[in-house]
Amino acid sequence: MADYYNVGKVTSPHGIRGEIKVYPLTNVPERFYDIPYIWVFDEKDIPCKYEIENVKITSKGMVLLKLKGIDSRNDAEKLKGLFLKVDAENALKLEEDEYFITDLIGMKVYTEEGELIGTLEEVLQTGANDVYVVKAKEREVLLPAIKEVIKKVDVEGKVMIVRLLEGL
């Protein structure tokens, strides 16, 4: 099966002509202007390909999409809660030390000494730098995504090695 990457989640229908309101899961919402089609996976994980007919980005950072074949509010309602994905061909090309959030979620996080901290569960986008939320046994550990802390990321092995700074 091809690789697919989440780029948004449908939050609700918008209007009566089949538009959908999408919460972008990318730090570049404008990329929707350049994507010719999107993949939607239903509850049974069956993919369906939709051509993007129109894109608008709201002042609040949400994305409004009109997909070919989704022509009514009822059609749009059926997509509510589903993730929009791009295939590898349409994925953004990453720079060194950049990762797709979907690749980071679920990683086991270890200290440089080999001690398991926990599992990376969420990425907070704060502006200055991302913050990784790691679920430990009895608490959450917040790790700034900076070179001083993140020492190694093994996407294939789903492992991250970190150096804990004073106070973390």
Swiss-Prot record:
Transmembrane segments: none annotated. GO terms for molecular function: ribosome binding. The keyword Manganese does not apply. InterPro entries: PRC-brl_dom (IPR027275), PRC_barrel-like_sf (IPR011033), RimM (IPR011961), RimM_N (IPR002676), RimM_N_sf (IPR036976), Transl_B-barrel_sf (IPR009000). Belongs to the RimM family. PANTHER family: RIBOSOME MATURATION FACTOR RIMM. This is Ribosome maturation factor RimM. It comes from Caldanaerobacter subterraneus subsp. tengcongensis (strain DSM 15242 / JCM 11007 / NBRC 100824 / MB4). The lineage of its organism: Bacteria, Bacillati, Bacillota, Clostridia, Thermoanaerobacterales.
